[in-house]
């Protein structure tokens, strides 16, 4: 099982679109997806594909958006769809965002639904419990 998880790790950010890059890491049986750039109408499809294509195991995961510069309603929609899939599969997940991203998520009252945490360590602790 560990061998499969090691295959998930991507050292460098992968170019998903002109404005979005993605990365995968493994932290104590929790997958951490890290994104940087813009999560918007132009990148939401690639975001969803990147996450779903790399969920080969039934391990909980964190979507780290602390390096996202811009999040629009399409990006929020992609996060909501991901959360709905996780809830259906009973798969643990959490979202971490910088102050701008967190404010956007809280503004539309999705913080609890998306298991929004203030930092990566809080998200990892949440998923270990």
PLM features per residue range, with description:
Residues 1-13:
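N-terminal leader/presequence segments that are low-structure
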Residues 4-5, 23, 70:
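Intrinsically disordered, low-complexity regulatory regions of eukaryotic regulatory proteins
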Residues 6, 18-19, 26, 33, ...:
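Generic signal for short, ordered secondary-structure residues
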Residues 11-49:
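STAS-typified acidic loop motif
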Residues 41-114:
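Amphipathic alpha-helical interaction surfaces in cytosolic regulatory modules
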Residues 115-122:
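Short acidic-hydrophobic, aromatic-tinged amphipathic segments that line or gate anion-handling sites
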Residues 127-129:
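A short, charged, amphipathic alpha-helix used as a generic interaction element across diverse proteins
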